[in-house]
C-alpha cells in the first residue's frame, strides 16, 4: 500500500509542484496589504489546496502524455508509468480526480477567476506545451513558459479576485519574473541532458542550435531577468530589503551565465540549473519577507 501511494505521489512531481505552490503562496501574501481577514485566510487556504491539486494533475497528465519520451531519457526512465508500476488508465483517472477536486474547491470555495485561470494554466502546460510545443519548436520553453509562470497570479487572484487594475499589474510583475527565469533555468538543464533530448527527438535549443548558442541565450535572458526583478521596487510593491537581495541574487546568476559561455561546460550547466532553483526560491522568499517588514514598520509607526 505504501509503495502504491509512493507511485501516485511521484506522478505529481512533488519537488516541482512545491516550487509552484510556494510562488502562489507568496502571491497571496503580497496581495494582502495588511492583516488578513478571516475570509482572506479561508480563501487563501482553499486556493492553496486547489492550486496544488491542479499542479499535481498537470504533472500526472504530462507523464501520461510523455511516457514514450520518458522511457528514452535517463533522467525520467524511472517514472512509475514508464516502469509499469501504474497503468495509463490509472494515471488518467488519478489526474481526473485531482482536476475535479481542484475545480470544485476553487469555484465553490474561492472564486471563479481563480478557477478559470488555474484551469487555463493546466491546459497550457499539460496539453499545449506537452503535446505540441515541446515536440515542435526549439522555443518550446519560451512560448510555453507562460503557463508555468502563472502561479503567483493564481495566488493573488485567490485572495483578491483580481478586482482592481493594481491587482492585475502587480500579479503580472510576479508572472513576468518567472516567465523570464524559465528559459535560462531549463536551457541549463537541456545543455547537460542534450544527448537524452536528441535521443528522444525533442528539439530543445542545445540540440537544434548547439551549446554555444544556448549559452549566449541563457546570458541574454539572465540579463533581462536582472532588470525584470527590479520592477517590483520601481512600482512600489517592494522596498530596499528586497532590492538588496535581488541585486545579490542577480549578480550571482549573471556570473553563472557568464561562466557558462567559455568554454561551454556540461557539468557547470548543471550547477547553473541548480542555482536557478535556489535563486527563484530565495527571490520570492525575499519578496515575502520585504512585504512583512514593511507591514511591521507601518503598524509600529
Swiss-Prot record:
Record-level Gene Ontology MF annotations: protoheme IX farnesyltransferase activity
Subcellular location: Cell inner membrane
Record's bilayer topology term: Multi-pass membrane protein
Membrane-spanning segments: 16-36, 41-61, 93-113, 114-134, 141-161, 172-192, 217-237, 238-258, 273-293
UniProt catalytic activity: heme b + (2E,6E)-farnesyl diphosphate + H2O = Fe(II)-heme o + diphosphate
This protein's record includes keyword Transmembrane: yes
Pathway entry: Porphyrin-containing compound metabolism; heme O biosynthesis; heme O from protoheme: step 1/1
Root EC class: transferase
Entry-linked InterPro entries: Protohaem_IX_farnesylTrfase (IPR006369), UbiA_prenyltransferase (IPR000537), UbiA_prenylTrfase_CS (IPR030470), UbiA_sf (IPR044878)
Keyword set, alphabetical order: Cell inner membrane, Cell membrane, Heme biosynthesis, Membrane, Transferase, Transmembrane, Transmembrane helix
One GO CC term on file: plasma membrane
EC numbers for this chain: 2.5.1.141
GO BP terms in the entry: heme O biosynthetic process
UniProt record similarity statement: Belongs to the UbiA prenyltransferase family. Protoheme IX farnesyltransferase subfamily.
Miscellaneous information on this protein: Carbon 2 of the heme B porphyrin ring is defined according to the Fischer nomenclature.
Primary role: Converts heme B (protoheme IX) to heme O by substitution of the vinyl group on carbon 2 of heme B porphyrin ring with a hydroxyethyl farnesyl side group.
HAMAP family (UniProt xref): CyoE_CtaB (MF_00154)
Protein name (record): Protoheme IX farnesyltransferase
Chain's gene name: cyoE
Amino acid at each position: 500500500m505504501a509503495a502504491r501511494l509512493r507511485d501516485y505521489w511521484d506522478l505529481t512531481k512533488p519537488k516541482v509542484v512545491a516550487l509552484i505552490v510556494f510562488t502562489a503562496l507568496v502571491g497571496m501574501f503580497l496581495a494582502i496589504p495588511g492583516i488578513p481577514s478571516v475570509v482572506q485566510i479561508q480563501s487563501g487556504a482553499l486556493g492553496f489546496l486547489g492550486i496544488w491539486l491542479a499542479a499535481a494533475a498537470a504533472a500526472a497528465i504530462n507523464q501520461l502524455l510523455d511516457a514514450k519520451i520518458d522511457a528514452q531519457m535517463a533522467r525520467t526512465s524511472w517514472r512509475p508509468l514508464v516502469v509499469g508500476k501504474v497503468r495509463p488508465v490509472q494515471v488518467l483517472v488519478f489526474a481526473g480526480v485531482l482536476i475535479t477536486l481542484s475545480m470544485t474547491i476553487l469555484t465553490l470555495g474561492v472564486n471563479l477567476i481563480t478557477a478559470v485561470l488555474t484551469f487555463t494554466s493546466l491546459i497550457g502546460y499539460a496539453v499545449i506545451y506537452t503535446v505540441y510545443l515541446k515536440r515542435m519548436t526549439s522555443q518550446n520553453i519560451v512560448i510555453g513558459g507562460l503557463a508555468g509562470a502563472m502561479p503567483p497570479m493564481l495566488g493573488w487572484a485567490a485572495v483578491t479576485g483580481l478586482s482592481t487594475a493594481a491587482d492585475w499589474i502587480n500579479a503580472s510583475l510576479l508572472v513576468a519574473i518567472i516567465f523570464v527565469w524559465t528559459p535560462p533555468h531549463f536551457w541549463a538543464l537541456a545543455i547537460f541532458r542534450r544527448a537524452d533530448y536528441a535521443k528522444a527527438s525533442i528539439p530543445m535549443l542545445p540540440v537544434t542550435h548547439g551549446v554555444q548558442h544556448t549559452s549566449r541565450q541563457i546570458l541574454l535572458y539572465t540579463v533581462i531577468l536582472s532588470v525584470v526583478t527590479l520592477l517590483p521596487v520601481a512600482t512600489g510593491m517592494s522596498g530596499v530589503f528586497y532590492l538588496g537581495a535581488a541585486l545579490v541574487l542577480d549578480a550571482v546568476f549573471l556570473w553563472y551565465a557568464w561562466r557558462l559561455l567559455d568554454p561551454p561546460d556540461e557539468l557547470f550547466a548543471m550547477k547553473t540549473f541548480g542555482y536557478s532553483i535556489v535563486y527563484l526560491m530565495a527571490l520570492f522568499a525575499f519578496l515575502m519577507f520585504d512585504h512583512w517588514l514593511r507591514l511591521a514598520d507601518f503598524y509600529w509607526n
